[in-house]
Amino acid sequence: MRTLMIHSDYLRYKTRSKTKIAEDIDDEKRVSGVDEALVAFIAVEKEDEENPELIINKAVKEILNVQNKVNAENIVIYPYAHLSSSLSNPDIAQKILKGIEAELLDNNEAVLRVPFGWYKSFELSCKGHPLSELSRTITTEPEEESEDSEEEPSEPSKMFILEEDGNIFDVEEYNYKNKTLRQLVDHEEGKTKDTGKQPPHVRLMREKELASNEPAADVGHIRWYPKGKLVKDLLSDYVYQLVTQRGAMPVETPVMYDLANPAIREHAEKFGERQYRLKTKHRELMLRFACCFGAFRILADSFLTWKNMPVGIYELSTFSFRFERQGEVVGLKRLRAFTMPDFHSVCLNDDHAREVFANQVDMCAQTETDLDVHYEVAFRVTQDFFDENEDWIKEVVKNNIKKPVLLEVIPKMKHYWNAKVDFAAIDDLGRPIENPTVQMDIQSAKRFGITYLDENEEQQYPTILHCSPTGSIERVICSLLEKTSTDKGNKPSLPLWLAPTQVRIIPVTDNHLDYAKEIYQQIRDSNIRVDIDDTAERVGKKIRNAGKEWIPYTIVVGDNEVENNSISVNRRVDNTKEEISIEDLAEEIHTLTKDMPFRQLPLPYMVSKRVKFD
């Protein structure tokens, strides 16, 4: 169910004509209205048919919760199919809407239910305060009980700020130098408020023709357009380059695993995320949420010795799956299917693991520079690990992270790790986008039977590190798009090496097109992504269109350029214009994109030939 709740001064409606699914109504319901109301526009979805009673109960609870916050005198139930592309059967939709009305009436609320299946004109006045417009997604998933509901309440974590000089402060007493670290702390403490607003990247990913949701698939499954696929592939190439330079060996493993395997089931339960599960005639299977299962199975079947250490296994999981709550799925930030770079390192022991861990934190920190994003960092450890390794933790913050971090000390181990570092960008709404991570795993080697032969030819269980140098590729793109909203004062852009079109050539008229094509070929041969705007638009409109596409360099070709065999380049980053040779332009771009991967433009180079997506 999708709802849009508007706190209004009044709502007035008038029925105009009926559809074939319209309910029968009395004359008094053809024209009506109410003052001082919470108007709940509702679309009942296909998924709601699984459990109408639960949907009714949850919808009523949500409506009453919002009504209580805004102190509305009346409630309006307004059927509004336009909120969803996956509508339920009309009979069930009516049943659910009437059920919501009945339950609200049972709560002694003043309720107006607008007729179902009629074309209507309506007039509404929104009050305009911060809570006057709220959207909600209500699902058939039952509300979860706490993992510790049958146990003693768990002791909460302790939160500190650890600075580079080793000083530790209480999070409430710390003098924050930047707001994003404070925002990370607020989120961890549950203080971040849900504004009901959509993150900017959701609009931008469609507007820039990168990606959009696939309505014919499950929620949280994305379709990628050519520009977005290019950016996604370049990021995948980047991570491959990053990890193989550090000795990782690429592998590929299945996406589906048998939960009858005790090690796989136990690890899945330890991970804690919701999973896609399916049953065949004789098996219960799970779609992987990361590459751990396949990597550990390979390592368990391999002959490892102390001379091999550290052993690195890398896989780009082009499809990882987590069955996130439907209401939590948003844009590229939280998905049910995503692309996860997964790097596992087998280390001799805990001492060796700490050394490799610090190096991998370095690698994760490097991505902050290469991607031109800003990360805040959370260093999470168990109390036992902190007591034994406090000095080492401070060294990592000083030498590898090099800025203040949120230090979370957990009373006891809940998962498979006893230490991990999480890097997170902060979105335009002040919420973290979890990106790179490094985790120290002290359980999986024994669980999966991974051993190595030490110097005395005795079998030992290693310590294993989990590392995703960037986090999911989708979240990287999410972070890049969100940065364009948070980075006030600068023109929005992607890093030059990720820009789908790096240079656009704009001929003034068709008479200049041949020269534009000559320039195009020279630039393309220099391994730079370039295209030509040969559309019938005026030059000013073409330049504005290039700006809307965030193209870093534009070259306008007119009579002067043709006569003098020259080019004049406009740089988006600083709005400068310069007459420059093609060789110097290529050198400038190659210098700015040094060591970054490159792919050619996967689109027609003539803009007039392109398809308009989404």
Curated annotation (Swiss-Prot):
The keyword Zinc applies. Binds 1 zinc ion per subunit. Its cofactor is Zn(2+). The gene is thrS. PANTHER family: THREONINE--TRNA LIGASE, CHLOROPLASTIC_MITOCHONDRIAL 2, THREONINE-TRNA LIGASE. GO terms for cellular component: cytoplasm. Belongs to the class-II aminoacyl-tRNA synthetase family. This is Threonine--tRNA ligase. Residues 200-495 are annotated as: Catalytic. GO terms for molecular function: ATP binding; threonine-tRNA ligase activity; tRNA binding; zinc ion binding. Residues 133-157 are annotated as: Disordered. Residues 141-154 have a biased composition (Acidic residues). It is found in: Cytoplasm. One of its GO terms (biological process) is threonyl-tRNA aminoacylation. It comes from the Archaea. It is an enzyme of class 6 (ligase). Its EC number is 6.1.1.3. Residues 1-138 are annotated as: Editing domain. The N-terminal domain is an archaea-specific tRNA-editing domain that hydrolyzes incorrectly charged L-seryl-tRNA(Thr). Catalysis of tRNA editing is performed by the charged tRNA itself. Keywords: Aminoacyl-tRNA synthetase, ATP-binding, Cytoplasm, Ligase, Metal-binding, Nucleotide-binding, Protein biosynthesis, RNA-binding, tRNA-binding, Zinc. Zn(2+) binds at C292, H344, H466. It catalyses: tRNA(Thr) + L-threonine + ATP = L-threonyl-tRNA(Thr) + AMP + diphosphate + H(+). Homodimer.
